[in-house]
Amino acid sequence: MTKTLKGESRDWLSPLFCWLYAAMLLWVLGLVTLGQRAMEGYYAHGFCVENWVLLLAAAGLTGLWVWRLRVRPAKLPQPASSVRMSWARAALYLALFAVQCLMARCLWFYFAFDPSAVRQGAEALALGQPLSEEWLVYFRQCPNNAPLTVILSLVYRLGKKLGLAEPYVLEVYGAALLTNLSVATAMAVLRRLKVRPSVRRVGFGLAAVWLLFSPFIIMPYTDTYACLFPVLGLLILLTGWKAPVRYGLAALCCSLGGAVKPSAYILLIAALLLGTIRFLFHKKDAALWKRGLCVLAAVIIGVLPGMALEKGSVKLLTGSTAPEEALGSAHYLMIGLDDQYWGGHSAEGVTYSGSFATAKERTRANLARALEEVQNRTMGENLHFFSVKAYKAYADGTFAFNSYLVEEPVRRSDRLSLFLRKIFYREGAWNPAYRAVMQCLWLMVLLGCLAAVLLRRREYAVQLCALSLLGLTAYQLLFEVWPRYLFLYAPVFLVLALLGVEKLGQRREKQ
């Protein structure tokens, strides 16, 4: 097993995950472009240009990027103070955060349904008020949102102490800050992997348009409040620290993110799977077994804080660490395999799950119904069903921000707010064009990911990213599907894409 971050693995099994992810990307790109007209009835994207045209544009822009890398070869690194560069980067991200806050101030509004429950629950906790019966029932059914509610209650309380007219705005700024930090961490991963500066600079510009100034920064919900943790776990796993330290800290990151958004655990699962494969292909000795046991112990210790946060938050809001009314993962598997709404939210599914008195009965019934859904379809029907779900997950480069419903709009009348609403709001005159640009950038990212898994499939960093994103896709195919669920791993998509672009540039230089 290699100890270098970009070195090649000796086993044959780890690169197989890259081949699987490459096949999945080709399938998705085919669905999004060639299958758009057949699939758009299941998910309306609202772009002003068809996806196949945007794919050609994305391929052309990527080709131009690679060509510029070839005609302008990397310069020798200039000596510079690492401390000075760190301060310069910090100042840059701080300035961008100020712009993000200005953008959020112009665009924020009150979201409906689950985000509304979290917002009102956090406000009640911060003010020391009891939860209404409506929200108490909600958190007993959906305890997965309890940790975020507790976290946001602390943010709301801080906003109250600062004397803000609407303390909720500080929660919005928190979403912008965590998105900012996730992009900064992705850039740190690329520096750690010694990706050439010219690639990082263009990649940073792409990240700024695609993520830093995405309308998602006004959404203080699970997607934004957990997006830092997977990419931070990735950075930790790529350090030169001892294995127990790396895996223990990565487990801590993923468990804290997983308390807010369970899919954050996927990166940790991928890392453990790759580590197990390398262990099996490595010559066994006493030192290796000892190191493996230390890693296992470190992971167990690392996940405890996240589990404590989750259980403690649920206990605080519902009075029980495991409410009998909780819908559970089996419920989301059931609605994820239901073809009535093609894996989307189902009110009938919630009613069905709520008809059982205990969690064990509900889980058993949900699993039986999920299996029945799959068995009642033919092989061709199942292929069509999962193709629709894959299309729904990957068909929107904005991660379907406009799918969020508005509970109460906040309409600022200044010129900047009016201008930004024309771009980012669904009813805005320029929103279709904005969505087309975001879709083109998203297709560029997917093409870069495809290049990375095909050309760098033996590198550990690529294998870890590919297996994580493959697991994320499997999660979308099996459970409830929403494009916004991909936002959590958007920084990981970015890292993998830039690794692919750099490799394309290197191959062009050799030619």
Enumerate the predicted regions with their spans.
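Start-transfer (signal-anchor) and selected internal transmembrane alpha helices
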Residues: 1-101, 291-300
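Membrane-interface anchor segments at the N-terminal boundary of transmembrane helices
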Residues: 41-55, 170-174, 389-469
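Extracytosolic helix-loop segments that constitute the early lumenal/periplasmic catalytic or substrate-binding loops
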Residues: 116-141, 147, 341-347
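Membrane-proximal stem/loop segments at transmembrane-domain junctions that anchor or position
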Residues: 131-132, 311-415
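Short hydrophobic/aromatic helix or loop-helix immediately within or flanking a transmembrane segment
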Residues: 137-164, 173-176
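Multi-pass, polyprenyl lipid-linked donor-dependent membrane glycosyltransferases
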Residues: 170-178, 205-237, 260-267, 485-490
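Transmembrane-helix motifs of polytopic, lipid-linked glycan transferases
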Residues: 173-194, 232, 447-451
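Transmembrane-helix signature of polytopic, membrane-embedded enzymes
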Residues: 186-209, 460-463
